[in-house]
Swiss-Prot record:
Its EC number is 2.8.1.-. One of its GO terms (molecular function) is magnesium ion binding. NCBIfam families: PRK10696.1. This is tRNA-cytidine(32) 2-sulfurtransferase. Homodimer. It comes from the Bacteria. One of its GO terms (biological process) is tRNA thio-modification. The gene is ttcA. Its cofactor is Mg(2+); [4Fe-4S] cluster. Keywords: 4Fe-4S, ATP-binding, Cytoplasm, Iron, Iron-sulfur, Magnesium, Metal-binding, Nucleotide-binding, RNA-binding, Transferase, tRNA processing, tRNA-binding. It is found in: Cytoplasm. Belongs to the TtcA family. Binds 1 [4Fe-4S] cluster per subunit. The cluster is chelated by three Cys residues, the fourth Fe has a free coordination site that may bind a sulfur atom transferred from the persulfide of IscS.
Length: 301
């Protein structure tokens, strides 16, 4: 019994530490990207996966202590996938005592009709889901749409675009839709997937499998995910470093002519030149007979 009590105490300490870390990361992301503002109505999109459950959990926790007032509404899109347990999310939302909506939209049939057998359906499914959620956000007056993508998702997406699309592009922490009618936020931007997995295990969320439709994660993303896991094992902190690089862009050190004017780089030698970091230099020649008078002291040039 004593060992059990010790184990429980240790587990509680680990959970509290992890919870504080995730809340701090989410709070920092919200603050730094101005994700949530006074009087915002945040539509938290809940799929039933670990990430969206954790996002909702943390948002509700921050809502109680935030210096601003904002509303959180949980929304699940029931896409009519076979075997989807329709009772789980309503029961969960009811247990939390929060406002929620279940949106019924049979995108599953549309995807099955359009995508050939054996091909991944995730791309079309995602687009149909996004369009439905955008429309519903306007209907309920939501000013922000919160999605559960985390740091690993963003880094994976960047490499997918680099390796298979020849684009240096990822997922932004905050995004305005093309028609400018909706703003999407990703509060888990600074959170690692491994922390969310551990958090979900502690919280014992009623996780709903994401592959009820029968579609498997595409091979390209699987390869990228495996690569990042290997890197993270060999060099802890590498994923964080890669993500931070997306926050420190130097357009003049890349090659995109659309974001930096490489064609017009005129010399400007007006004014006094700043001193270089050396005091003297010698210039020599490959000639066999070297004329020492050709050596140049550039100290005062």
């Amino acid at each position: 019994m004593r060992m059990n009590q010790q184990d429980t105490h240790k587990e509680n300490l680990e959970f509290n530490k992890l919870q504080k870390k995730l809340r701090r990361n989410v709070g920092n992301a919200i603050t730094e990207y101005n994700m949530i503002e006074e009087s915002d109505v945040v539509m938290a999109c809940i799929s039933g996966g670990k990430d969206s459950f954790a996002m909702l959990d943390i948002l509700l926790g921050l809502q109680k202590s935030a210096p601003i007032n904002f509303k959180v509404i949980a929304v699940n899109l029931d896409q009519k996938q076979p075997g989807f347990p329709e009772h789980i999310l309503p029961n969960y939302f009811e247990s939390l005592g929060i406002p929620y909506y279940i949106v019924d939209k049979d995108t599953y049939s549309v995807v099955r009709e359009k995508i050939p057998e054996g091909k991944t359906t995730c791309g079309l499914c995602s687009r149909l889901r996004r369009g439905t959620l955008y429309s519903f956000a306007e209907k309920i007056g939501a000013t922000k749409i919160a999605l559960g993508h985390h740091m690993d998702d963003m880094v994976e997406t960047m490499f997918l675009n680099m390796f298979y699309g020849s684009r240096l592009k990822s997922m932004p922490p905050k995004l305005r839709s093309d028609d400018q009618r909706n703003v999407v936020i990703r509060p888990l931007t600074y959170c690692r997937e491994k922390d969310l997995i551990a958090y979900a295990e502690y919280r014992e969320y009623p996780i709903i499998p994401c592959n009820l439709c029968g579609s498997q994660e595409n091979l390209q993303r699987q390869n990228i995910k495996a690569m990042l896991i290997d890197w993270d094992t060999q060099t802890p902190g590498r994923v964080e470093s890669i993500f931070k690089s997306t926050q420190n862009i130097s357009p003049s050190q890349l090659a995109d002519r659309n974001i930096f004017d490489f064609e017009n780089l005129p010399l400007d030698r007006t004014g006094k030149r700043a001193e270089y970091e050396f005091t003297e230099a010698e210039v020599s020649s490959s000639n066999i007979n070297i004329d020492e008078s050709m050596f140049i002291d550039v100290t005062n040039i």
